[in-house]
Amino acid sequence: TGTPIENSLAELWSIFDFIMPGYLYTYKKFKTMYEIPIVKEEDESSMQKLKMLIEPFVLRRTKQEVLTELPEKEITILENEMQEEQEEIYLSYLSNIKEEVAKLIGQTDSGKNQMKVLAALTRLRQICCHPNLFIKDYKGESSKLEQCMEITKEAIKSGHKILLFSSYTSMLEIIEKRLKDENIKYFKLTGATKVEERVDLVDEFNNNNEIKVFLISLKAGGTGLNLTGADMVIHYDPWWNAAAQNQATDRAHRIGQTHTVTVYKLIARHTIEEKILELQENKKALSDQILSEEGVTASQLTKEELLKLLQN
């Protein structure tokens, strides 16, 4: 499989059950014996037992093992302080939803409530990107956007070509407007981009040095593209699943790349974005011990993890 397990032991079970039905028992038994103890209780003994069961059947082809000639990849996390008006909006919304989210998490209708909780978390993430994603008539600025544009302009002056990823197509539209204002030539790829057009855009970007920036929505263009014409990657906002961002970075850091790839992850300081990074690190320790795949999905967060996201 070319699909990361993404820290979901249910996915691991389903793959084994397809290949060798019954080897990892029924899913109900597997969940009781392994998934709950490992994911929720971080039980080392259960983790080692599962690893022993699957190890003889797992051959991992990692980039580090087979692509020793690849150039370096330098990853830097760049923090930014929210603008005063932006911060006021963030703290006001956080204050309004805290109590409601705590109630929703404690109720039994988990599916419906979970959607409400994730929607609230999405609003916080959007405010970090640009309040205009949340408040349509917002006329103020976004410190992250200013930081992003500063990096982009300096990189272009130094001869770099950039892949710029965001989870939000509406954020890409805001960045697109700024690129036009600065007379920076760019391409954009989202879920609305047709397959034939994707191929043409990729070829043109890799071969035309006048096109300096490729705006890409994380879900639409995070996999399956060869964009070695770029040697810089900017992740405008963090996604729950670190593996998805790593795959997106690998659009540039892959066979055919001859330059060091510089990766910038933009993070709004003292916000939910910092908490998402912490979650990724915590989950990585667990998943490294199983299959060395980093990842967390928002739907898999525990009550404690969700509440921690809302801490100031």
Where are each of the predicted segments found?
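Conserved Helicase C-terminal RecA-like lobe
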Residues: 68-86, 91, 105-225, 296, ...
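Short glycine-/polar-rich loops that comprise or flank the Walker A/P-loop
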Residues: 10-14, 30, 73-75, 182-185, ...
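Cytochrome P450 catalytic domain signature, combining two hallmark sequence patches
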Residues: 96-103
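A conserved SF2-helicase RecA2
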Residues: 225, 239-312
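SF2 helicase motor core recognition
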Residues: 8-9, 172-174, 214-235, 241-258
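Conserved P-loop NTPase motor "coupling/switch" region that bridges the ATPase
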Residues: 1-64, 257
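Conserved nucleotide-binding/hydrolysis micro-motifs of P-loop NTPases
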Residues: 3-9, 21-24, 38, 84-87, ...
